[in-house]
Amino acid sequence: MKKTLLLNSVLSELIASLGHGDMVVIGDAGLPIPPETRRIDLALCRGIPPLLETVRVIASEMQVEKALIATETGQRSPHIRDGLGQLLPNTPFEEVSHEQLKALCRQARAVVRTGEYTPYANVILVAGVVF
């Protein structure tokens, strides 16, 4: 049995297979996921799992070079933006429009769907390198 924080085998495989610059989207329950993009659906019910907890666990194993969030996140859900900043304190953040974020989902290696019910609670984690 794994000793590290992340136990989900699908997420572990995804993170182990990432290359520099690959993107992983962690989204709320309502984020549209393009049919051609891999969907990893963790949503059990409203609020479970929450987005920030999901980011915390994924970031414990993923080298994150930068994070992208929608401008609307800070405007409509500042507690999500602040929480992401606390979880990823040394990670640069870039803001894009919500429409741009949705379009970037097509280029992502996967979209991880959470049970989050907060507007604009989505983040794209861009993989870095550990050397």
Swiss-Prot record:
Does the record bear Ribonucleoprotein in its keywords? Answer: no
Q: Which GO terms describe its cellular component?
A: cytosol
Q: Does the keyword Transport apply?
A: no
Gene3D superfamilies xrefs: RbsD-like domain (3.40.1650.10)
Reactions the enzyme catalyzes: beta-D-ribopyranose = beta-D-ribofuranose
For this protein, the record's SUPFAM superfamilies field holds: RbsD-like
Q: Chief localization class?
A: cytoplasm
The catalytic residues are: 20
What Enzyme Commission number(s) apply to this enzyme? 5.4.99.62
Instruction: Note the SS bond partners.
Output: none
Matching InterPro entries? D-ribose_pyranase, RbsD-like_sf, RbsD_FucU
**What role does this protein play?**
Catalyzes the interconversion of beta-pyran and beta-furan forms of D-ribose.
Subunit notes for this chain? Answer: Homodecamer.
Checking NCBIfam families in the record gives: PRK11797.1
- Tell me the protein's name: D-ribose pyranase
Give the gene that encodes this protein: rbsD
